[in-house]
Each structure stands twice: as C-alpha cells, then as structure tokens.
Amino acid sequence: MRPSGRQPDQLREIRFTRRFTKHAEGSVLVEFGDTRVLCTASVDDRTPPWLRNKGSGWVTAEYGMLPRSTHERMAREAARGKQGGRTQEIQRLIGRSLRAAVDLEGLGERQITVDCDVLQADGGTRTASISGGYVALHDAITHLMKQGKLKRNPLFGAVASVSVGIYQGVPVLDLDYAEDSNAETDMNVVMNDANAFIEVQGTAEGHAFRMDELNSMLALAQSGIQDIIAAQRAALEQG
C-alpha cells in the first residue's frame, strides 16, 4: 500500500495555473500533489556570447528551492556563496529537456530563461519543473508571436516529465517524498508528445533492478506523461 493510498499507476492531482505572476512573459504555478513550483519564462533579446551572430537562440533554466520548502529550513544557496551540485544537475536537466522541444534557429537571436522556484517540496520537484516549465515556455513563445517577433512557432511539441520507482517491491508512478525517501529504485523520465524519450535517469538505491522492472517503470512513465501532457494542453486551451 502506498502511503498516499494511490494505486501504483495513479498520478497525484496535477494543476497548472497560468499567469501566476504579471511581469514574466510566461508564468505558471505547477502542482503535483503537495509539490508546488513557480515556473517563469523570461525573454531576453540577446543570446549568450558564444551564440552571437550565429542566427540561433537559446533556452536555459535555473532551479532553486525556497528555504522552507522542505520540512526543515535550508540555508539559501546565495548565502553560502555557490550553488550545490544537485541544483546544477537539476537545472541542466530542465534546460536540456526544454531545448528538445524548440527549434533554436526558429527562435531567432534571443534567449528564454525558465526559472523554476520550488515553493513546497513533496517529491518530484525536477519533474514538476520540467512539466510546468514547458507551459511557461509555451506562453513566452506565444507572447513573442503575438508581438510579431517570430515568423513561425519554433515549438516542436509538448514535453513533460514524471518520476517512477520501485517501492516495497512494486513499480509505482509519481513518487511523493514518503515513497522517494524509501524507494528501492528511483527514476526520472522525460518524454515528448510523440511518445519518444528525451531523458531517462535511474538509480538503484536498495537493490539492482531487473529488465522486467525497468520495462514496467518505463510503461508507467509513458502512461503518466501522456496524462500530464493532456493536462498541459487543457491548461493552454483556456486562452
């Protein structure tokens, strides 16, 4: 039995609240159960120095957790003077995942930065950041198109992510903190709306997992991501 009472293949309740803040070109509060992440997409009409005058744009991401997003207060990374390795790993994952959905030449010589700030953490913050970050990115690109700054939509399609794992010997979908902290295997999967994989990260924590368990986890992720993409589309169709 999962601590939340969910079935092995059941997602937490997912919600995307668009235009959550007023200044960013794209702004989304994404909720996966009790995990809440604010994703904002900001447009800069300059590219990184290494991309200047090359006719291509860039999408990057930054990730952070509020000090009391967890059970006990964490010191701000800014106060420590540097980002931790986990933070750098996660924001690179988010950036790679979102770039997989964008024709960077079609974006033109500009950069979109997607900031993912965890307000409350209950497992799956990186997967929520990718799923919410896509919606914020979509809105930022729509903003550019409405302003006439893009000739065509550079988005290939949707991108979403979810965690899967083995908890008490059973493959499960969308782990919360209680499950994640006790899982025998933890895996993060990123896919697009063409049902293709962008990234798979998996680690055996308790015991090595078998091929049949891997296939079960990937099947759970595939099904869950289809549902997340449907929720993204429903949010974006609200205009």
Swiss-Prot record:
Enzyme class: transferase
Keywords attached to this entry: Nucleotidyltransferase, RNA-binding, rRNA processing, Transferase, tRNA processing, tRNA-binding
Keyword Translocase found: no
Protein EC: 2.7.7.56
Alphabetical GO biological process terms: rRNA catabolic process; rRNA processing; tRNA processing
GO molecular function annotation: 3'-5'-RNA exonuclease activity; tRNA binding; tRNA nucleotidyltransferase activity
Reaction equations catalysed: tRNA(n+1) + phosphate = tRNA(n) + a ribonucleoside 5'-diphosphate
InterPro entries reported in the protein's UniProt record: ExoRNase_PH_dom1 (IPR001247), ExoRNase_PH_dom2 (IPR015847), ExoRNase_PH_dom2_sf (IPR036345), PNPase/RNase_PH_dom_sf (IPR027408), Ribosomal_Su5_D2-typ_SF (IPR020568), RNase_PH (IPR050080), RNase_PH_bac-type (IPR002381), RNase_PH_CS (IPR018336)
Pfam families cross-referenced by the UniProt entry: RNase_PH, RNase_PH_C
Residues binding phosphate, per UniProt: R86, G124, T125, R126
Keyword Cell membrane in record: no
Domain of life (superkingdom): Bacteria
Function summary: Phosphorolytic 3'-5' exoribonuclease that plays an important role in tRNA 3'-end maturation. Removes nucleotide residues following the 3'-CCA terminus of tRNAs; can also add nucleotides to the ends of RNA molecules by using nucleoside diphosphates as substrates, but this may not be physiologically important. Probably plays a role in initiation of 16S rRNA degradation (leading to ribosome degradation) during starvation.
Family to which this protein belongs: Belongs to the RNase PH family.
HAMAP family according to UniProt: RNase_PH
Record-given protein name: Ribonuclease PH
Classification lineage: Bacteria, Pseudomonadati, Pseudomonadota, Gammaproteobacteria, Chromatiales
